């Protein structure tokens, strides 16, 4: 079950697939929210809570058993954002892919910044519209065995298109071969660069990097200040892409997301708009 619910003026996602609660938006009464989330986790036997909080709330979360796994500078107008996690099972704290993730990061450290990008002229990039929702959902279902949000559901894609998400697609002769999205925090003018999915036979052609370049350009033109991503820690391609585009690594969330059939660690990368 994947359920997004509002508690007073806070929003949380309760996810059986991810075996966690994701605090998506903090309301005013944070103390009561923390108690409520603890209660739900114990009742449903969920093993992790994950939240993005402002610096002035960080200490309150730490006092309630949360640890900081990552950071985004200047996310708020006069404060940073912190990714805070609380574990309800010891096994959830232990990474299954720590060696692979370490190898990826060590390699990525050797990669220089190189934002130059282009793709073959046969490809066509566009911002997706509502008529693309069905084939976009099918594209995502081809690429991901499991995913933390139901992007294989055209109704979910339609709903998010109508609120705060722009989807980008690259087509080859009318067929979607790569996709991504900008999940916009309209109030704070920050944006998550996410949902990158390239068909296997079209990988290593620079499509993700080109998508990111276009996404950044459009978001910057619309006044967005901070760009960030939460990338699979064992993916050489995505971590290299963000490093080449000038993003800074700022932490890792352990066993955070059920993606491609496993719980995986996720790396945080961010970049401030120039």
Swiss-Prot record:
**Annotated source species:** Methanococcus maripaludis (strain DSM 14266 / JCM 13030 / NBRC 101832 / S2 / LL)
From the UniProt record, report the name of the gene that encodes this protein.
ablB
Record EC number: 2.3.1.264
Any idea what job this protein has? Catalyzes the acetylation of beta-lysine to N6-acetyl-beta-lysine, a compatible solute produced by methanogenic archaea that helps cells to cope with salt stress.
Q: Which family does it belong to?
A: Belongs to the acetyltransferase family.
Which InterPro entries does UniProt cross-reference here?
Acyl_CoA_acyltransferase, GNAT_AblB, GNAT_dom
**Is-annotated flag, keyword Acyltransferase?**
yes
Catalytic function, reaction form: (3S)-3,6-diaminohexanoate + acetyl-CoA = (3S)-6-acetamido-3-aminohexanoate + CoA + H(+)
Explain what the UniProt record notes about the effect of disrupting the gene for this protein: Cells lacking both ablA and ablB no longer produce N6-acetyl-beta-lysine and are incapable of growth at high salt concentrations.
Recorded hits in Pfam families, A to Z, give: Acetyltransf_1
The reply on keyword Transferase is yes
Q: What is this protein called?
A: Beta-lysine N(6)-acetyltransferase
Per UniProt, the keywords (alphabetical) are: Acyltransferase, Transferase
**What positions does the domain N-acetyltransferase occupy?**
123-274
GO molecular function term, any single one: N-acetyltransferase activity
Record-linked SUPFAM superfamilies: Acyl-CoA N-acyltransferases (Nat)
Lineage, top-rank taxon, reads Archaea
């Amino acid at each position: 079950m994947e359920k997004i619910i509002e508690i007073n003026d806070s929003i949380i996602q309760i996810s059986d697939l991810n075996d966690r609660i994701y605090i998506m938006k903090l309301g005013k009464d944070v103390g009561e929210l923390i108690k409520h989330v603890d209660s739900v986790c114990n009742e449903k036997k969920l093993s992790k809570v994950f939240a993005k909080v402002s610096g002035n709330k960080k200490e309150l979360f730490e006092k309630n058993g949360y640890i900081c796994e990552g950071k985004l500078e200047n996310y708020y107008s006069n404060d940073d954002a912190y990714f805070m996690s609380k574990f309800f099972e010891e096994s959830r704290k232990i990474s299954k892919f720590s060696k692979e993730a370490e190898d990826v990061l060590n390699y990525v450290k050797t990669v220089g910044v190189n934002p130059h990008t282009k793709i073959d002229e046969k490809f066509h990039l566009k911002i997706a519209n509502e008529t693309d929702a069905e084939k976009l959902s099918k594209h995502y279902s081809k690429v991901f065995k499991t995913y933390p949000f139901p992007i294989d559901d055209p109704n979910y894609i339609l709903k998010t298109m109508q609120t705060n998400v722009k989807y980008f697609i690259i087509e080859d002769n009318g067929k979607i071969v790569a996709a991504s999205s900008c999940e916009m925090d309209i109030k704070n003018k920050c944006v998550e660069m996410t949902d990158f999915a390239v068909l296997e036979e079209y990988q290593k052609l620079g499509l993700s990097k080109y998508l990111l370049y276009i996404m950044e350009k459009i978001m910057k033109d619309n006044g967005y200040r901070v760009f960030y991503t939460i990338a699979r820690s064992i993916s050489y391609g995505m971590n290299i892409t963000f490093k080449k585009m000038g993003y800074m690594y700022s932490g890792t969330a352990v066993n955070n997301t059920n993606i491609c059939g496993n719980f995986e660690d996720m790396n945080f990368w961010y970049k401030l708009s120039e």
